[in-house]
UniProtKB/Swiss-Prot annotation:
Membership in a protein family: Belongs to the uracil-DNA glycosylase (UDG) superfamily. UNG family.
Localization annotation: Cytoplasm
Top-level taxon of origin: Bacteria
HAMAP family: UDG (MF_00148)
Organism: Vibrio parahaemolyticus serotype O3:K6 (strain RIMD 2210633)
Main location (coarse class): cytoplasm
UniProt-listed InterPro entries: UDG_fam1 (IPR002043), Ura-DNA_Glyclase_AS (IPR018085), Uracil-DNA_glycosylase-like (IPR005122), Uracil-DNA_glycosylase-like_sf (IPR036895)
Biological function: Excises uracil residues from the DNA which can arise as a result of misincorporation of dUMP residues by DNA polymerase or due to deamination of cytosine.
Protein known as: Uracil-DNA glycosylase
GO molecular function, one term: uracil DNA N-glycosylase activity
Class in the EC hierarchy, top level: hydrolase
EC number: 3.2.2.27
Gene3D superfamilies (UniProt xref): Uracil-DNA glycosylase-like domain (3.40.470.10)
Gene symbol of the encoding locus: ung
Amino acid sequence: MNQSPTWHDVIGEEKKQSYFVDTLNFVEAERAAGKAIYPPAKDVFNAFRFTEFNDVKVVILGQDPYHGPNQAHGLCFSVLPGIKTPPSLVNMYKELAQDIEGFQIPQHGFLQSWAEQGVLLLNTVLTVEQGKAHSHSKTGWETFTDRVIEAINQHQHGVVFLLWGSHAQKKGRFIDRSKHHVLAAPHPSPLSAHRGFLGCKHFSQANQLLASQGKEPINWHLPLTV
């Protein structure tokens, strides 16, 4: 029998909490009212679907989902195939091209292969209304994602947290740095990337930290087309 804890084991109880029920009811009511809410209901929890709890090696924290049509699919910074690569991800690719030998910038922004290797691509808030950034902040999602980070902090060892921008850094302030590794930099947004995100070498550093623990490094290379 597999004794490894799953997401259900570590955050299953959260789904019974009144705040979480209220959050889901709010989102459902917004959809029922005819508002375009992203990502689609089936994709809201994809970060957990593609990266099982016990497989988490790296956590990248985003803020809220992309709010344009067909962009968000439940993994922070990632967009569906066929959608133009958003500006922050363009800068992530620029950094990868400098940092990871042989990295070729793909023609898409679909990051699922990272998630499948143990990179938890977690937004702080898991839904958004079309065209309205942060429209679902303070609806309970932040509490839920705090619990997610607390569970990783408590039950795992040697996870590498990539915290880009003040929002992510504030969110990760309680991470136990004697158990885990925290790499902080400005956000990859065009507004701040040149203040130290570009040149941060977080992708190679994350792999060095994983390798030093005997863990398999992340293959950051993406298929050129999807």
